[in-house]
Amino acid sequence: MQIIRTIEELRQILAPARRAGKRIGFVPTMGYLHKGHLELVHRSRAENDVTVVSIFVNPLQFGANEDLDKYPRDLERDAALLHRADVDYLFAPAVSDMYPQPMQTVVDVPTLGNQMEGEARPGHFAGVATVVNKLFNIVGADAAYFGEKDFQQLVIIRRMVEDMAIPVRVVGVETVREEDGLACSSRNVYLSPEQRAAAIIVPKALDEAERLYRSGVDDPDALEAAIRTFIATEPLATPEVVALRDPETLERLTAVQGRPVLVALFVRLGTTRLLDNRVIAHVAQEQAA
């Protein structure tokens, strides 16, 4: 595996592969890799000739009171994991290379990005869309891989790619979980032992949402309220966002029965926010399958 630090070097190295018609897969990350990231790598390697992983903690997607400086970083550890996973190229640019001067161009998908997590983190998804767009321009990949844990992000990136006619296939990969069901996340390292034990309320809340859906609850407001109440049974957990949405458009639902439903959770434990979600398939669809 080769570690590349600059945009120009990466473009030069990938040019021969592109001329030879090789498929390039791309996994953008902010580092401090876990099993979920490695699953994205495995998918890319299985489907492409060359795999590029980027590690870049993007300052544009952090708010003024968020954890940019504290975000976990360990490039040596991450590089060792990627080497063992047979990644071809690790792109680890400095902020000064990605943003040599203050950005005046911003890519925003406001209808999708200003709701749900975007309500709690104003400007976050504009920062995400801007850096992902720039990385797509740099790498020129045929396919890019994103975890479904960050479902809103995945929907936003797909829409950006469609709107901007970017020639890349966006692949969503199923959420990888710990043995107790908690979604793998770089931010899990922030949790104290007590908070880590309490965090299991998040996947359990998704189970409860599915149980209520299967029982015939049709009013989205009632279902959201029930999920909030369920999460609040854990004293250390605060539900910041509980949303039932259309999984393709993120539109609010007036009724949940008779259609697939995205249940999206944004739960705070101490200073740590955990994201999780589940798309609950319509019963009739499952029976017909």
UniProtKB/Swiss-Prot annotation:
Homodimer. This is Pantothenate synthetase. Disulfide bonds: none annotated. (R)-pantoate binds at Q61, Q153. It catalyses: (R)-pantoate + beta-alanine + ATP = (R)-pantothenate + AMP + diphosphate + H(+). The lineage of its organism: Bacteria, Pseudomonadati, Pseudomonadota, Alphaproteobacteria, Hyphomicrobiales. The reaction proceeds by a bi uni uni bi ping pong mechanism. It comes from Brucella anthropi (strain ATCC 49188 / DSM 6882 / CCUG 24695 / JCM 21032 / LMG 3331 / NBRC 15819 / NCTC 12168 / Alc 37) (Ochrobactrum anthropi). GO terms for molecular function: ATP binding; pantoate-beta-alanine ligase activity. The active site is at H37. It holds the Pfam family Pantoate_ligase. Its EC number is 6.3.2.1. It is an enzyme of class 6 (ligase). GO terms for cellular component: cytosol. Beta-alanine binds at Q61. Its main location: cytoplasm. The gene is panC. Pathway: Cofactor biosynthesis; (R)-pantothenate biosynthesis; (R)-pantothenate from (R)-pantoate and beta-alanine: step 1/1. NCBIfam families: cyt_tran_rel, panC. One of its GO terms (biological process) is pantothenate biosynthetic process. The keyword Cell inner membrane does not apply. Catalyzes the condensation of pantoate with beta-alanine in an ATP-dependent reaction via a pantoyl-adenylate intermediate. Belongs to the pantothenate synthetase family. InterPro entries: Cyt_trans-like, Pantoate_ligase, Pantoate_ligase_C, Rossmann-like_a/b/a_fold. The keyword Transmembrane does not apply. ATP binds at residues 30-37, 147-150, 176, 184-187. Keywords: ATP-binding, Cytoplasm, Ligase, Nucleotide-binding, Pantothenate biosynthesis. It is found in: Cytoplasm.
